[in-house]
Amino acid sequence: MRKLSTALYAIICTLTINLNSLAMTETDTPNQEDGATLTIFAIYHDDVPAAKKSTIYSDYIEPFTKEFESITGRKIRVIVDQDKPPYSNFDYRKSNTSETILEWLTLSNRYKQERDENNESLYSYNDRVILITNNLLAGSSLLGGTAGIAFAGTPAAIASLGSKRTLGHELGHTFNAIHADGEIKYNGWWCETFMYTPRLPLRADCNVFSQSNRQRIKTYVDSLFDGLNVHEIPEEDITILD
């Protein structure tokens, strides 16, 4: 496997897990040829039970897409896929989670190329591919473990169906959001923004990014369309969290 250059940093997010009922939906409203539109390909792993699929979009995906569109002014198109090996049966529970995301990064690029070859969608490096899994990548829901993983500023991520915030957290990393800019907010009760870590189950999910991360995301996404190379991850966010 080729080693990524030092400009790519592995960010592994370990979140406290309490499993909820989940599910599936699909949106396809923006015009694919609109240059301001990004696509998220959400691939359900084969281990996700059918009973969980009816609410995945509304509970996990939509909170992120609403916030992203508010931040960037750009539309997100969500395409849900499933029952498609070798993508939907990808072996994500490995001893080395960094190797896991490296393999998924390669495989997800192949997935986009395959869709382009089959005239299903045009290939774009900017589009994101996220594998949604039923189980943690490592550890257990009882004792804790790795709930999701993403390379900062790259178009692939994996998120488990534990905390509803995990999917938005990992996608946030792919758009250059960082832990250090995560916040706790208060509006009658305390809540955590998408990037705040470590998670405390007593606090609610804000389903928003902090103002600092909003600016990071906006700048980064604008750079994707302007052809600029904006990628700066502070040292403290390179660390693998246990």
Task: Report each predicted region and the residues it spans.
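Short, solvent-exposed loop/turn elements at domain surfaces
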Residues: 47-53, 139-141, 203-206
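Bacterial N-terminal signal peptides that target proteins for export
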Residues: 1-8
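Propeptide-to-catalytic entry region of secreted or membrane-anchored zinc metalloproteases
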Residues: 23-121, 225-241
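Bacterial N-terminal signal peptides
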Residues: 9-18
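Active-site-proximal segment of zinc-dependent metalloprotease catalytic domains
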Residues: 28-31, 110-185
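The catalytic-center signature of Zn2+-dependent metalloproteases
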Residues: 147-242
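Short, polar loop/linker segments at the starts of domains and inter-domain junctions
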Residues: 51-59, 146-147, 206-209
